[in-house]
Amino acid sequence: MTYRLPFVAVILFVTAKHVVLALENANWIEASKTVPSDSTQTTRVAYRRITGGFNERFLRQLEKKPGVNDKRDEERANFFEAVFKNTLFNAFGYRSDAKAKLQDPNSNIFVNLLRRIFVWWAKNKPEFNKNADMHKEAMV
């Protein structure tokens, strides 16, 4: 047990550090949206306040500005979604096939656990159901 103690200590330290940094970041963002603090200064020329954070107008402009890589990001997301679905289909097949393989007494326990997760996840996904197209045609 003593050989795991440094590893656990490092994990706890890194987790605590991330939590502290996230809280500081959240406080900084929240402070930039509220009333300016005492540390704000005025310039001699324009008499406007200089704050350390982003103001709301700048953030709104960033939201409205179209991203250069929006289309590329969408294509990349669609590609990874297709790869994910193909990998799942190659691993488990249709949902009904995965249900049938769950009943097999010779199958691996770990693989059965993955199959159960897949069956639960794919219950509302028409691309993983064999009879989804037939149901659609019958309803039309």
UniProtKB/Swiss-Prot annotation:
It is found in: Secreted; Host nucleus; Host cytoplasm. Residues 1-22 form the signal peptide. The keyword Metal-binding does not apply. Its main location: secreted. One of its GO terms (cellular component) is host cell cytoplasm. Keywords: Host cytoplasm, Host nucleus, Secreted, Signal, Virulence. A motif (RxLR-dEER) lies at residues 57-76. It comes from the Eukaryota. The RxLR-dEER motif acts to carry the protein into the host cell cytoplasm through binding to cell surface phosphatidylinositol-3-phosphate. Belongs to the RxLR effector family. Secreted effector that completely suppresses the host cell death induced by cell death-inducing proteins. This is Secreted RxLR effector protein 37. It comes from Plasmopara viticola.
